[in-house]
From Swiss-Prot:
The active site is at E49, D60. It is an enzyme of class 4 (lyase). Its EC number is 4.2.1.20. The lineage of its organism: Bacteria, Pseudomonadati, Pseudomonadota, Betaproteobacteria, Burkholderiales. This is Tryptophan synthase alpha chain. It comes from Burkholderia mallei (strain ATCC 23344). Tetramer of two alpha and two beta chains. CDD domains: Tryptophan_synthase_alpha. It comes from the Bacteria. Belongs to the TrpA family. The gene is trpA.
Amino acid sequence: MSRIQNTFAALAAQGRKGLIPFITAGDPDPAKTVELMHALAEGGADVIELGVPFSDPMADGPVIQRSSERALAKGVTLHSVLDDVKRFRARDQKTPVVLMGYANPIERMGADAFAAAARDAGVDGVLVVDYPPEESHDFAAKMRAAGIDPIFLLAPTSTDDRIAAVGQVASGYVYYVSLKGVTGAANLDVSSIAGKIPAIKSRVPLPVGVGFGIRDAATARAVAEVADAVVIGSRLVQLLEQAVPERAAAELAGFVAELRAAIDGAAKPAA
């Protein structure tokens, strides 16, 4: 089993739900990315999603767009992100790392070269936002051959055919985008999420992580009641944007620990 599969199997055995925080590599400071990744793990992350900055992040809201712009301005590239993962792996061989980004940087490197470099760095999963599952069979096969889980998005608007297409190519987990629009949007409707997850699980035999619109411990706990994992990104990127640099890692770890406690509370049966 992959590191991601092992993580979700352990969570299921313990009756717990997963916490998947996202940060953008290189933001606010490329020299601090590995430290921030360790802060996420120390706060209780089960999987870390590491954003690969891109100049036109069409699925992302203004908070993550700004983080991409800052990282690119400081020279962050796909190669430097892979170096960050490799340095993280020197201390942490347990926490899975998923790269989340767009097709263009991967295609510039070439899928085969990327798969080899990502494997060697210690990457566990890849989510390419603009790769539709129907057109991703070759890419997904190359990732799996390198021991990397190809992860795909589903949304409230996803048809049964799209869900089935994801089921044919995805492994690790599925990321369910709980809202129409871009990351960071508000007005989360947990009941609508609960209604969609059975349709996903009937066609995709994988854990379902839910993200977009989760901003605090209360919403994280509510989502954990119905999903296998909670994905949170914009709120963390905003925290880093506003934090005093010397305090950023500690504040990040503290906020993630609050989310962890809330999610663990949701996973426990009532006394």
